[in-house]
Amino acid sequence: MARYRHSRSRSRSRYRRRRRRRSRYRSRRRRYRGSRRRRRSRRRRRRGYSRRRYSRRRRRY
């Protein structure tokens, strides 16, 4: 039982750490991308620039 408990906590902490790291990377990339690309293609995005493609890419990260 002790062994099971330990393995469980270990996997949980690992998942949590990975999740946090992922979100951090995502936020950083989003900010960098937005600041650089927003000014250039603002009109294009508003019109509906490849919404499907963007959502797909966003879901992946």
Swiss-Prot record:
Single GO molecular function: DNA binding
Described function: Protamines substitute for histones in the chromatin of sperm during the haploid phase of spermatogenesis. They compact sperm DNA into a highly condensed, stable and inactive complex.
PROSITE patterns: PROTAMINE_P1
Residue ranges that the Swiss-Prot or TrEMBL entry lists as coiled coil: none
An individual GO BP term: chromosome condensation
Gene: PRM1
Residue numbers spanned by region Disordered: 1-61
Tissue specificity of this protein: Testis.
Keywords, sorted A to Z: Chromosome, Developmental protein, Differentiation, DNA condensation, DNA-binding, Nucleosome core, Nucleus, Spermatogenesis
Gene Ontology terms: cellular component: nucleosome; nucleus
Protein name: Sperm protamine P1
Subcellular location: Nucleus; Chromosome
Similarity remark: Belongs to the protamine P1 family.
Organism listed in the record: Aepyprymnus rufescens (Rufous rat-kangaroo)
InterPro entries: Protamine_P1 (IPR000221)
